[in-house]
């Protein structure tokens, strides 16, 4: 059992991401936006906002972005000649002695100021979130597909030393990072407990047995959920937060359990004399996908949420399919592949849906691990490692585009988005 636990930690620690994906470009004219910043009050802070905002708008795939300093009064005639549609001006304002991040959005076509958005500067290191919220305001003005996912927090476990990991929060670019659980213990596998991101589950390896705890960020309080010999991990939370799927091993071999957060009861829903782990909700929380060695090697199965329900094998390609996440009827998983031309084992991300046998390859090289869907299912974050880099990866499924955000001086054990 100890071997299984170490194996699970180890495989999730095989960090990987692809430098780039094949980019499929369609011929389209994106609205041009010029992002400017003011040097008044706090030029350095405004410049940071400016850089993150410009990058967010580029990442969205909805804008043709250029950057500039504040040019004073808006010269609409000149901007129209340059075929610029919008100007976003970021600045730092001071009101009643308090600093505020401010966005002014100008519509060049109508020659008007159309939006003013203020974001309080509660702490200087929170500037990425101010910029992410500004990007959402600009995007919503054009009624483009939502990019609200940009303002979500990432919760992750980071290695500190032998037997020690801390839990931290970050923005999606990893510019902002803050440790919130530091106790010289093994704190691993964090998983958001609700859509509001005010609570999360995680496993703490105590004196003898691993324990699943729920932590309230605002109150800094803990609640004991479950414990089990050898293994105790929350792998999925239902859309309303009322149920969770856990991998527990009270009798030696791990199985998937369904936990009711209101009744505080757990029900065993797999019974196999082998390994059943990593259950994730499917089909509006009516069924689950999970990883099992029923095929003699790790593979993906699905079943309804009942002990007597039969399990159905989902994949018949590959000899090691694991590390999964799901959104409605879509499943993203890690597939271990043959050695590449450099003699390295490749771990790639693949995407499948329940109503199609088509397997969509999402990465092409390196070690790509821990895929996590965004809350709208349109994007995937993951960890990527190659000999040249270690980064947080982002895949925009609608645009066949990917981005990498370098991870410097941090090694991630697990994360949730």
From Swiss-Prot:
Organism superkingdom: Bacteria
Protein's cellular compartments: Periplasm
GO cellular component: periplasmic space
UniProt cross-references to Pfam families, sorted A to Z: PD40 (PF07676)
Subunit description: The Tol-Pal system is composed of five core proteins: the inner membrane proteins TolA, TolQ and TolR, the periplasmic protein TolB and the outer membrane protein Pal. They form a network linking the inner and outer membranes and the peptidoglycan layer.
NCBIfam families: PRK04043.1
Descriptive protein name: Tol-Pal system protein TolB
Organism of provenance: Helicobacter pylori (strain HPAG1)
Lineage start: Bacteria, Pseudomonadati, Campylobacterota, Epsilonproteobacteria, Campylobacterales
């Amino acid at each position: 059992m100890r071997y299984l636990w170490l194996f699970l930690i180890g495989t999730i620690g095989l960090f990987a991401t692809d430098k780039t994906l094949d980019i499929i470009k369609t011929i389209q004219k994106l609205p041009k936006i010029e992002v400017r910043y003011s040097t008044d009050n706090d030029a350095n802070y405004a410049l940071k906002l400016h850089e993150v905002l410009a990058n967010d708008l580029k990442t969205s795939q909805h804008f043709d972005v250029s950057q500039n300093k504040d040019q004073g009064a808006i010269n609409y005639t000149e901007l129209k000649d340059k075929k610029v549609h919008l100007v976003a001006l970021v600045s730092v304002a001071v009101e009643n002695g308090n600093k505020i991040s401010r966005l002014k959005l100008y519509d060049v076509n109508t020659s008007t100021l159309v939006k003013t958005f203020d974001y309080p500067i509660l702490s200087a290191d929170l500037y990425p979130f101010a910029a992410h919220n500004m990007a959402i305001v600009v995007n919503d003005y054009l009624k483009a597909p939502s990019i609200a996912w940009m303002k979500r927090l990432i919760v992750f476990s980071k290695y500190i030393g032998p037997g020690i990991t801390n839990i931290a929060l970050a923005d999606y670019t990893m510019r902002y990072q803050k440790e919130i659980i530091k106790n010289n213990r093994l704190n691993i596998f964090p998983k958001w407990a609700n859509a509001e991101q005010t609570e999360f589950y995680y496993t703490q390896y105590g004196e003898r047995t691993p324990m699943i705890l729920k932590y309230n960020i605002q109150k800094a309080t803990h609640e004991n959920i479950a414990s089990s010999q050898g293994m105790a991990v929350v792998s999925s939370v239902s859309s309303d937060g009322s149920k969770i799927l856990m991998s527990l091993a009270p009798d030696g071999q791990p199985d998937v359990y369904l936990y009711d957060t209101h009744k505080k009861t757990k029900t065993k829903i797999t019974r196999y004399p082998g390994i059943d782990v990593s259950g994730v909700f499917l089909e509006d929380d009516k069924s689950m996908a999970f990883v099992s060695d029923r095929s003699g090697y790790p593979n993906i199965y699905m079943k309804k949420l009942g002990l007597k329900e039969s399990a159905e094998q989902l994949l018949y390609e590959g000899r090691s399919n694991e590390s999964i996440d799901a959104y409605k009827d879509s499943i993203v998983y890690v597939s271990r592949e043959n050695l590449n031309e450099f003699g390295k084992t490749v771990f790639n991300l693949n995407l499948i849906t329940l109503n199609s046998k088509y397997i969509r390859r999402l990465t092409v090289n390196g070690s790509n691990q821990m895929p996590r869907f965004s809350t709208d299912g349109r994007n995937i974050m993951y960890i990527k490692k190659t000999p040249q880099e270690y980064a947080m990866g982002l895949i925009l499924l609608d645009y066949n585009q990917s981005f990498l955000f370098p991870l410097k001086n941090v090694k991630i054990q697990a994360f949730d988005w």
